[in-house]
């Protein structure tokens, strides 16, 4: 799957479009199909929904250490930390596209799970490498309506 996403990113870079928005929309479509594969049911509680999206849905794409937590300062915002982002691991971004996160496709998958349960959301991927975790990605999940 990483090879496919790498090809999509290369194509989108040639088009000079909004790559992250395009990756999110592609991820949304992939997420809908993955929801069908894992028999995803509508969840009412946001904490249960985020848990299932993180450990049931995303485990179909990659198997890495993940953690979900509520943001301390901001209301209706959650942080999903992926210690080894699948697409960040295999795709290197040129220097001129420094802020680009190849894991934006996962944002669309998370949004699909939230939308399937009736939650409108905005998900953003931030690469946060550290010395021990060079491919760590933090997904900021903002619930727009409750």
Curated annotation (Swiss-Prot):
Lineage: Eukaryota, Fungi, Fungi incertae sedis, Microsporidia, Unikaryonidae
Subcellular location: Golgi apparatus, cis-Golgi network; Endoplasmic reticulum
Organism: Encephalitozoon cuniculi (strain GB-M1) (Microsporidian parasite)
GO CC, alphabetical: endoplasmic reticulum; TRAPPI protein complex; TRAPPII protein complex; TRAPPIII protein complex
A Pfam family per the record: TRAPP
Keyword Transport: yes
Coiled-coil regions, chain positions: none
Family: Belongs to the TRAPP small subunits family. BET3 subfamily.
Oligomeric form and interacting partners: Part of the multisubunit TRAPP (transport protein particle) complex.
UniProt keyword list: Endoplasmic reticulum, ER-Golgi transport, Golgi apparatus, Transport
CDD domains: TRAPPC5_Trs31
Protein name per the record: Putative trafficking protein particle complex subunit TRS31
PANTHER family to which the protein is assigned, alphabetical: 41-2 PROTEIN ANTIGEN-RELATED, TRAFFICKING PROTEIN PARTICLE COMPLEX SUBUNIT 5
Function per UniProt: May play a role in vesicular transport from endoplasmic reticulum to Golgi.
Gene3D superfamilies linked: Trafficking protein particle complex subunit 3 (3.30.1380.20)
GO biological process terms, semicolon-separated: endoplasmic reticulum to Golgi vesicle-mediated transport
């Amino acid at each position: 799957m990483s090879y496919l996403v790498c090809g999509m990113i290369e194509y989108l870079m040639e088009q000079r479009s909004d790559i992250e928005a395009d990756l999110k929309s592609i991820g949304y479509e992939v997420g809908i199909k993955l929801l069908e594969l894992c028999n995803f049911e509508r969840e009412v509680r946001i904490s249960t929904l985020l848990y299932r999206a993180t450990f049931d849905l995303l485990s179909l794409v990659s198997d890495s250490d993940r953690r979900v937590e509520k943001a301390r300062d901001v209301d209706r915002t959650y942080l999903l930390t992926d210690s080894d982002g699948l697409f960040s691991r295999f795709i290197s971004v040129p220097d001129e596209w420094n802020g680009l996160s190849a894991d934006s496709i996962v944002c669309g998958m998370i949004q699909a799970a939230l939308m399937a349960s009736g939650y409108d959301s905005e998900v953003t991927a931030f690469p946060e490498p550290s010395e021990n975790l060079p491919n760590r990605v933090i997904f900021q999940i903002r619930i727009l309506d409750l």
